[in-house]
């Protein structure tokens, strides 16, 4: 399409301005999981909102009326870090981060109807979170987690004497994981009890470490483990937790077990699904997750993968009897989806599970005794499910969800019935005003081997008779997806409202479309996925007349960053006006510097020294590829990214500069694989969007679009003969 035609069309669109800006995106309220009270009348959830003027993020807790959808403020005390229902009417337990014990937290008891009238039940001498409660006689037993010292005590950073040397000494892996160097402390689940004295509960300060007696065990497992890694039985007597297999090398294998242990720690925890154990189905030795007790406390449901070094293998539901030596039962094992979380119905007959299907996080139900060929039934709801809880003892669940068009969707869902909307953020928050599902639609295109899904995200005020440049966004993983959910980092709506039509493809390797598509990227990073992307681009060029591919851009992070680097040296790289590579691999042999070796050893069919040819096969730095580089490229890489060393980004930038390709490096010394700090996020958006807008022509047609000059961070340029005028 001729640039002049696009320019006229864009000028017509430019008069609408920018509907959803990075400032709106970053400052919009962020709400967490809504958890209902035992009777299903109210739900409590956290909320925070970044303020660009004061440079802080005030936080608090709200109450959601489950009948009316009305929201009221429970507390604006930012020191309240956690709230959970006590299990008695509207009574609450909350954690206060300020305490008389330096570095510790306080446990407080209150009532949702009069939150200010609270009393302190006790102190915990260290950071502690993830409370789960269960009645046990006249006590309330609880579990939660914090960090443990090697002796098994709760770690308190404020009480630790600073060492005189900064040296670290390692005899095994991990050395560093995700964004931090591994130290001697580790996560552990602790148990305790609240004792009732008259009308009040008190805590005696005694905690039992349930994990430390198992040498080399850790739960929740970092970097993303949380309260979903453990559970407390409804009778309060037994605790289940997930840990990586203590006897196996954690950086090389994904194998993990579900352990059970008495709440009082009177016995050492034992695994119920140990590799090659009598209770473990034959051949099952992968990652375990999401242990949850049945209502009668007699069974545990959990998820487990089969393969021992593959983090994206298909999860299968298992059910084991507590205290029995019988083998665990596999439930609906032929279902070609990968469940992510489980809950039991109040009668124990039905399982509610979440799983991704066709780029949407859905809720499903199935009998707890379902046979292998049973296909779970989907429950109707909007958007994607991020969490859910039962409303009282009914079959209805309160869903906390989100979508591409709203960052918070609270709704009631009941199997066999339409969902009932309670609160949708895009209908209330001024920052999200105008966002909705009408600007988003799926696209299916014949790919390299099968039909491939993409999302089309259109700008606010979209007019099908006008033309918009293409923003081609490639997701990470590679075993991931662009789902119908809200991203707090790469948000397609922010890109679209600069004046683009966003195409967000789910090529080979993506999750939620059957395990085969996910598996097919193994040892084929630059093969089928690249062909899929090229075919999608061609389909958009030939069939979507409102998309200008001549002035399009492409961007990606993580695996998407690798793919951008790969595209730069391929034919598709010449189809774009600008590229953005965020934390992408560049040199094939550099992958050995990553943290989780099981990832590369699975995806490249062997170790770095035994299958070197596979690592070199998709090496973006090969001279024959670099010789083709010419498309302007922004490189983003941060210092705390230990998945992919910052040297990858610097090396990529070095070559771009020496090749004379218009390029810029954006580095954050205090960020990791993702840029999460609000002010850094704003700079990221100003640089990334400013970069693509400059080369796509948006800056010329729409004066309100972001420019590189909008960023107030000074550019470092020591080259007197700089060839490129920014």
From Swiss-Prot:
Residues 268-292 are annotated as: Disordered. The active site is at residues 558, 641, 673. Its main location: secreted. GO terms for molecular function: aminopeptidase activity; serine-type endopeptidase activity. Pfam families: PD40 (PF07676), Peptidase_S9 (PF00326). It is an enzyme of class 3 (hydrolase). Keywords: Aminopeptidase, Glycoprotein, Hydrolase, Protease, Secreted, Serine protease, Signal, Virulence. InterPro entries: 6-blade_b-propeller_TolB-like, AB_hydrolase_fold, PD40, Peptidase_S9_cat. Residues 1-19 form the signal peptide. GO terms for cellular component: extracellular region. Glycans are attached at residues 96, 252, 485, 605, 699. It is found in: Secreted. One of its GO terms (biological process) is proteolysis. It comes from the Eukaryota. Its EC number is 3.4.14.-. Extracellular dipeptidyl-peptidase which removes N-terminal dipeptides sequentially from polypeptides having unsubstituted N-termini. Contributes to pathogenicity. Belongs to the peptidase S9C family. This is Dipeptidyl-peptidase 5.
């Amino acid at each position: 399409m001729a640039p002049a035609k696009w320019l006229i069309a864009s000028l017509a669109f430019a008069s609408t301005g920018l509907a959803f800006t990075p400032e709106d995106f970053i400052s919009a309220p962020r709400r967490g999981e809504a958890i209902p009270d035992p009777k299903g009348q109210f739900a409590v959830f956290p909320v925070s909102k970044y303020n660009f003027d004061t440079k802080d993020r005030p936080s608090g807790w709200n109450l959601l009326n489950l009948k009316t959808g009305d929201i009221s403020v429970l507390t604006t005390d930012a020191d309240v870090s956690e709230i959970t229902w006590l299990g008695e009417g509207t009574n609450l337990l909350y954690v206060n981060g300020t305490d008389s014990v330096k570095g510790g937290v306080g446990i407080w008891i209150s009532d949702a109807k009069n939150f200010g009238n609270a009393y302190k039940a006790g102190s915990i001498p260290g950071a502690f979170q993830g409370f789960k409660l269960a009645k046990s006689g006249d006590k309330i037993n609880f579990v939660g987690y914090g960090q443990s010292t090697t002796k098994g005590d709760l770690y308190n950073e404020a009480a630790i004497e600073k060492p005189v040397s900064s040296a670290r000494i390692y005899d095994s892996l991990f050395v560093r994981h995700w964004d931090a160097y591994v130290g001697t402390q580790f996560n552990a689940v602790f148990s305790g009890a609240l004792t009732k004295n008259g009308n009040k509960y008190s805590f005696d300060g005694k905690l039992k470490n349930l994990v430390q007696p198992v040498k080399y065990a850790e739960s929740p497992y970092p970097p993303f483990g949380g309260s979903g890694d453990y559970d407390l039985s409804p009778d309060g007597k037994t605790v289940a937790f997930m840990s990586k297999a203590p006897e196996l090398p954690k950086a090389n294998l994904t194998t993990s077990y579900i352990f059970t242990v008495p709440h009082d720690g009177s016995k050492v925890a034992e695994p119920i699904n140990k590799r090659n154990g009598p209770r473990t189905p034959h051949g099952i030795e992968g990652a375990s997750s999401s242990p949850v007790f049945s209502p009668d406390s007699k069974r545990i449901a959990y998820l487990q993968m089969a393969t021992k070094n593959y983090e994206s293998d298909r999860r299968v539901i298992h059910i084991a009897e507590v205290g029995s030596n019988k083998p665990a039962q596999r439930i609906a094992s032929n279902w070609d989806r990968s469940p992510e979380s489980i809950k039991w119905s109040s009668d124990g007959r039905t399982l509610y599970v979440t799983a991704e299907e066709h780029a949407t996080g859905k809720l499903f139900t199935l009998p707890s005794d379902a046979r292998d060929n049973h296909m779970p039934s989907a429950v109707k709801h909007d958007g994607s499910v991020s969490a859910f809880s039962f409303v009282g003892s009914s079959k209805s669940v309160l869903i906390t969800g989100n979508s591409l068009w709203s960052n918070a969707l609270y709704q009631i869902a009941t199997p066999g019935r339409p969902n009932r909307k309670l609160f949708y953020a895009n209908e209330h928050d001024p920052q999200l005003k105008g966002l909705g599902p009408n600007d988003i639609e799926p696209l299916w295109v014949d790919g390299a081997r099968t039909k491939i899904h993409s999302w089309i995200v259109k700008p606010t005020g979209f007019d099908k008779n006008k033309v918009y440049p293409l923003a081609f966004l490639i997701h990470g993983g590679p075993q991931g997806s662009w789902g119908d959910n809200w991203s707090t980092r790469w948000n397609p709506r922010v890109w679209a409202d600069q004046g683009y039509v966003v195409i967000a493809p789910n090529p080979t390797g993506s999750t939620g479309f059957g395990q085969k598509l996910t598996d097919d990227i193994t040892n084929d990073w630059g093969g089928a996925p690249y062909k899929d992307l090229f075919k999608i681009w061609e389909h958009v060029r030939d069939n979507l007349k409102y998309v200008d591919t001549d002035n399009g851009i492409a961007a990606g992070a993580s695996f998407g960053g690798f793919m951008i680097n790969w595209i730069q040296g391929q034919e598709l790289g010449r189809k774009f006006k600008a590229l953005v590579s965020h934390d992408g691999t560049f040199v094939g042999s550099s992958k050995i510097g990553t943290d989780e070796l099981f990832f590369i050893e699975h995806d490249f069919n062997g170790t770095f020294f035994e299958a070197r040819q596979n690592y070199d096969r998709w090496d973006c730095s090969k001279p024959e590829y670099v010789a083709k580089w010419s498309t302007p490229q922004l490189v983003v890489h941060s210092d705390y990214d230990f998945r992919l060393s910052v040297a990858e980004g610097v090396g990529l930038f070095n070559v771009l500069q020496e090749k004379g390709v218009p390029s810029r490096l954006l580095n954050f010394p205090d960020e990791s694989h993702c840029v999460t700090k609000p002010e850094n996020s704003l700079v990221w958006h100003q640089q990334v969007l400013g970069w693509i807008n400059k080369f796509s022509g948006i800056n010329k047609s729409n004066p309100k679009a972001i420019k590189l000059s909008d960023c107030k961070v000074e550019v470092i340029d020591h080259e007197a003969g700089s060839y490129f005028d920014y």
